[in-house]
């Protein structure tokens, strides 16, 4: 009987410890990524520019996971409203492009690319591409170029690639393809980078 009791006590402590480890608090206030995202959405639009920067900084610090959670909240237009989520995603994509925030940018782009791969709604996919147009770097260009043949995303992807700094190599590889549409070929040819 004593052995069973000791075993139960040990199991209780082990479960308690495991629960605390897996909760993985994100910040000094012990908030999880899900909580940070929910808090940010509840506070937007922000009252001041300072509040806005604080909220966007917290969202950007959640990295790919937080961006993915936000992007997964996008719904087809016929099923609901996306304004708050789009506002938050646009804010984060813009926030990480400012000087001094470069370390946050790769994770945000990773989250946007992963969300793009999961998203099934064309309008929401185009929105995610537009956010990548804001914050993607040459490191993301090849992953984005994979969508050039998508009938709905081909043009937005091409516009994004043209906008991404140092994406010339990706654009040149596209220019060499024989299966581009005439409009795509013209856009690549007349791009200042190609």
Predicted regions and their residues:
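Bacterial N-terminal signal peptides that target proteins for export
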Residues: 1-9
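Short N-terminal segments immediately surrounding and downstream of signal-peptide cleavage
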Residues: 24-45
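Short, charge-rich amphipathic alpha-helical segments embedded
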Residues: 63-82
């Amino acid at each position: 009987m004593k052995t069973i009791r000791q075993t139960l006590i040990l199991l209780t402590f082990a479960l308690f410890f495991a629960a605390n480890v897996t909760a993985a608090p994100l910040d000094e206030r012990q908030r999880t990524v899900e909580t940070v995202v929910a808090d940010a959405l509840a506070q937007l639009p922000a009252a001041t520019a300072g509040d806005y920067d604080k909220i966007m900084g917290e969202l950007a610090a959640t990295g790919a996971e937080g961006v993915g959670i936000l992007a997964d909240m996008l719904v087809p237009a016929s099923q609901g409203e996306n304004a708050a989520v789009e506002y938050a995603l646009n804010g984060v994509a813009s926030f990480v492009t400012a000087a001094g925030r470069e370390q946050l940018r790769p994770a945000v782009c990773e989250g946007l690319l992963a969300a793009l791969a999961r998203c099934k709604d064309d309008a929401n996919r185009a929105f995610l591409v537009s956010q990548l147009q804001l914050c993607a770097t040459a490191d993301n260009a090849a992953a984005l170029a994979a969508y050039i043949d998508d009938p709905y995303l081909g043009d937005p992807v091409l516009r994004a690639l043209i906008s991404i700094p140092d994406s010339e190599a990706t654009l040149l590889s596209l220019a060499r393809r024989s299966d581009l549409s005439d409009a795509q070929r013209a856009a690549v040819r007349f791009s200042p980078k190609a």
